[in-house]
Amino acid sequence: MSAPCHCKHVDDSSSNDKLSALSPELQQEFKDPNHPANLICELCRLFYDNNWVTGTGGGISIRDVDGTNPNLVYIAPSGVQKERIQPWEMFLVELPDEKILRTPNDIPKELTKSYKYKPSACTPLFISCYTLRDAGACIHTHSQHAVMVTLFFENEKEFAISHIEQIKALPKLKYNDETGKIEKIGSMEYYDKLVIPIIENTPHEEDLTDSLQEAIKNYPGASAVLVRRHGIYVWGETVWKAKVYNEAIDYLLELAVKMKLAGIPLVKQE
């Protein structure tokens, strides 16, 4: 059960009134507060307040792992103000063929104001996390802490930090030779070293896909990929796990910036 959202960007009663313009099927679908589309709205407002998805940047995608069809993926559209996003504005994609089942352009014009919605440029990167890691959700933010870390380590291909309590919030992952999948075998320990790959930014988001896929394959223990001078992609087995991982990693990135400025090594020598 999700925690209630206390954000004040959108009037919930107004949102409920607008549902009446939708088909009866969609009205029923979006009444569930735990529906992936509603959770994306909730998290977008939270992330906006954290300064992670400002200026229409960033994005969130959720795979309906708890629904009747876990191949259904809900993706926030491109170029919209994340703190004002509504559940009917999501793109609905079905894996593995990546078939678009529904777009916000199908919604009554009185709700969309005839705005022409575009799929998120992050879509191929989100799909990569689902296909390569069997993720339940993927989060992309433009966190300043993520950007700063990639600038501090301008010539490095990875970020590493150890002996910080918050590391324990992240999963310990291992490749299973029998299943051919990356599986969670527990949680990281205080003394473990967290390593996150860094890939180079590109002029267009979708052009990051090959580099992201390569990083995911080369770093089986990672739950995130940093994009230099851009932000970060974080995924998890469920939307709430992805949220926890994203928050924990951002905490560690912020701490790393402060440690670097203070001349404190990020990886403690034994």
From Swiss-Prot:
It is found in: Cytoplasm. It comes from the Eukaryota. It catalyses: 5-(methylsulfanyl)-D-ribulose 1-phosphate = 5-methylsulfanyl-2,3-dioxopentyl phosphate + H2O. Keywords: Amino-acid biosynthesis, Cytoplasm, Lyase, Metal-binding, Methionine biosynthesis, Zinc. Zn(2+) binds at residues 140, 142, 230. The active site is at residue 165. It is an enzyme of class 4 (lyase). Its EC number is 4.2.1.109. One of its GO terms (molecular function) is zinc ion binding. Pathway: Amino-acid biosynthesis; L-methionine biosynthesis via salvage pathway; L-methionine from S-methyl-5-thio-alpha-D-ribose 1-phosphate: step 2/6. Binds 1 zinc ion per subunit. The keyword Zinc applies. GO terms for biological process: L-methionine salvage from methylthioadenosine. Substrate binds at residue 122. InterPro entries: Aldolase_II/adducin_N, Aldolase_II/adducin_N_sf, MethylthioRu-1-P_deHdtase_MtnB, Salvage_MtnB_euk. HAMAP family: Salvage_MtnB_euk. Catalyzes the dehydration of methylthioribulose-1-phosphate (MTRu-1-P) into 2,3-diketo-5-methylthiopentyl-1-phosphate (DK-MTP-1-P). PANTHER family: METHYLTHIORIBULOSE-1-PHOSPHATE DEHYDRATASE. Belongs to the aldolase class II family. MtnB subfamily. This is Methylthioribulose-1-phosphate dehydratase. The gene is MDE1.
